[in-house]
Curated annotation (Swiss-Prot):
Glycosylation sites: 16, 90
Organism: Encephalitozoon cuniculi (strain GB-M1) (Microsporidian parasite)
Chain residue ranges for the region called Disordered: 1-21, 49-102
Name of protein: Uncharacterized membrane protein ECU08_1550
Topological relation to the membrane, as annotated: Single-pass membrane protein
Keywords noted in UniProt: Glycoprotein, Membrane, Transmembrane, Transmembrane helix
One GO CC term, this protein: membrane
UniProt feature, compositional bias: Polar residues: 93-102
Length: 102
């Protein structure tokens, strides 16, 4: 019985990169790009790369409270309690920085 030759054999990868070899290369490149992108996004959010991460011992600049915080605290002209006061524990510098920067 004579064997038939299939010229459109997808399993045959020649030097031109046709068939399955070419498809596998494209899939590999796409997967690598997606994985690298996800790693960069995760590292940026964690502060491992970029300037968004908190530095140990570094002073952060004072920022103006947002209008939402102003309304909650009685308006922009209301004086905040003295440091160390237990009157409003939600308005400490640490909690304000935490609310602003996550």
């Amino acid at each position: 019985m004579a064997e038939s030759v299939n010229e459109n054999n997808n399993n045959a990868g020649d030097s031109n990169g046709s068939g399955r070899t070419k498809r596998n290369t494209i899939v590999t490149i796409v997967v690598v790009v997606i994985v690298v992108t996800l790693i960069i996004i995760l590292a940026t959010k964690k502060g491992w790369i970029g300037g968004s991460g908190k530095k140990v011992g570094a002073e952060e600049p004072a920022t103006k409270l947002s209008s939402k915080s102003d309304d909650r605290n009685g308006g922009p002209n209301k004086k905040s309690p003295a440091k160390g006061s237990s009157k409003d524990d939600n308005n400490t510098e640490e909690s304000v920085q935490s609310n602003l920067y996550g």
